[in-house]
Regions:
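Iron-sulfur (Fe-S) cluster-binding segments and ferredoxin-like electron-carrier domains
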Residues: 107
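Positively charged, aromatic-accented nucleic-acid-binding surfaces
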Residues: 1, 111, 116-134
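Short Lys/Arg-enriched helix C-cap and helix-to-coil transition segments
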Residues: 95-104
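Residue-level detection of the helix-turn-helix DNA-binding "recognition helix"
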Residues: 89
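Basic nucleic-acid-binding alpha-helical/helix-turn surface characteristic of O6-alkylguanine DNA
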Residues: 1-79, 130-134
Length: 134
């Protein structure tokens, strides 16, 4: 089972997938980068608190090319926007569980615990553009 996904920094040397699961993830990423409507089908190891699970489940319902705000997710699961943002920041499966589709009411918002322009927010921006959401 897949327990965590990390984005690699630019210029990281790539190496062949070490096992079946890594190969499946790599192939599914290739499909997603060709077509943002490609579906990830990977065995995920359930992690996180009950609240985090609710947030991550709600993000799964946000379709490709769409976004939802932290406040909208909070209202849906009877929580607060900051708690939703914290749960998104703790998401162990970025890309597969699409927390990049959750945005601030005032704009892009943070991504992977980063709330200032930087590496992860550049990824969020690219993903949303790739999916046609912005």
């Amino acid at each position: 089972m897949l327990s965590k996904i990390d984005y690699l920094p630019p210029n990281t040397a790539l190496r062949p997938a070490a096992n079946y699961l890594a190969k499946a993830f790599s192939e599914q990423c290739d499909q997603y980068f060709k077509n943002p409507f490609a579906v990830f089908d990977l065995p995920l190891k359930p992690l996180g608190t009950a609240h985090q699970q609710k947030v991550w489940s709600a993000t799964q319902a946000i379709g490709v090319g769409s976004t939802s705000t932290y406040g909208e997710i909070a209202k849906q699961i009877k929580s607060g926007p900051r708690a939703v943002g914290t749960a998104c920041g703790a998401n162990p499966y970025p890309l597969v569980t699409p927390c990049h589709r959750v945005v601030s009411a005032q704009g892009l918002g943070g991504f992977m615990k980063e709330d200032a322009p930087g590496f992860y927010r550049q990824i969020k921006l690219w993903l949303l553009r790739h999916e046609g959401a912005i």
